[in-house]
UniProtKB/Swiss-Prot annotation:
This is Large ribosomal subunit protein bL33. InterPro entries: Ribosomal_bL33, Ribosomal_bL33_CS, Ribosomal_bL33_sf, Ribosomal_zn-bd. One of its GO terms (molecular function) is structural constituent of ribosome. It holds the Pfam family Ribosomal_L33. It comes from Treponema denticola (strain ATCC 35405 / DSM 14222 / CIP 103919 / JCM 8153 / KCTC 15104). One of its GO terms (biological process) is translation. It comes from the Bacteria. Belongs to the bacterial ribosomal protein bL33 family. Keywords: Ribonucleoprotein, Ribosomal protein. GO terms for cellular component: cytoplasm; ribonucleoprotein complex; ribosome.
């Protein structure tokens, strides 16, 4: 089997409307906790907190 890499693909979910607006990658060796960023939500039309979720 293939070896697991340190880079993982994740989705960023808006904390207000609960939609997954962004996808990005994260290095698990450098960032241990969940990623939280202030990003623009086009559905709410404002900057909101986006939290890391898994891509299904």
């Amino acid at each position: 089997m293939a070896k697991k890499t340190a880079v993982e693909l994740i989705a960023l979910q808006c904390s207000e409307c609960k939609r997954r607006n962004y996808t990005t990658s994260k290095n698990r060796k450098n960032i241990q906790g969940k990623l939280e960023l202030m990003k623009y939500c086009s559905f709410d039309r404002k900057h909101t907190l986006h939290k890391e979720t898994k891509i299904k």
